Amino acid sequence: MTQFEKLDLLLREYGGTIQTFQVLNNGISKSVFYAYVKERGLEQAAHGVYVSPDTWTDTMYILHLRCNQAVFSHETALFFHDLTDREPLKYTITVRTGYNPSRLQEDGFQVYTIKKELHEVGTTTMQTSFGHAVPVYNMERTICDLLRSRKNIEMQVFQDALKQYAKCKDKNLRMLMKYAAMFHVENILRPYLEVLL
């Protein structure tokens, strides 16, 4: 089997999206890989991320590969959890404080930062519409994030999301109040919940 044939198999195995480190881990040199990229017409979707020309580009998955600490949050997380019917105009992510988000912002992503010890709280994994697994904050964390960022969020979006959350069978009010205390939004959230529940 030639190295190009091996790369064809790898590309298929990874669903048409491949990263340079995956190629190197399979014993193929960068020079052979770059010749393959040119020969097969792969597109560079991000630094070290290449996509086959016959593969639909999954922007959310590419963003996750590009910045693996990014967690989909705010309006994007609402959309994942069916707590809104509005498809986000921009994808919203949260990264740890200290990460430089300027490149992501230049590329049209809305980026929030949070201290390291709160970054992983409420993280779950969900499937994009293309079937790729990406990190997303759970419903309870998302509600708290919306309240924390209420100056940047339309209040109607928050209220509609909270109404949808109240109807959910899998809501976890105990977790919601725990997160509200952690993120210092408990006093803001409580009156909304009293009206809805």
Language-model segments: residues:
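Generic detection of intrinsically disordered/low-complexity segments and helix-coil linkers/edges
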Residues: 27-30, 44, 159
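Short amphipathic alpha-helical interaction segments
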Residues: 26-38
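Short amphipathic alpha-helical interface segments
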Residues: 1-16
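Residues that cap or flank secondary-structure elements
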Residues: 11, 24-25
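A short, conserved structural fragment
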Residues: 40-46
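Nucleic-acid-binding surface
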Residues: 6, 17-22, 49-197
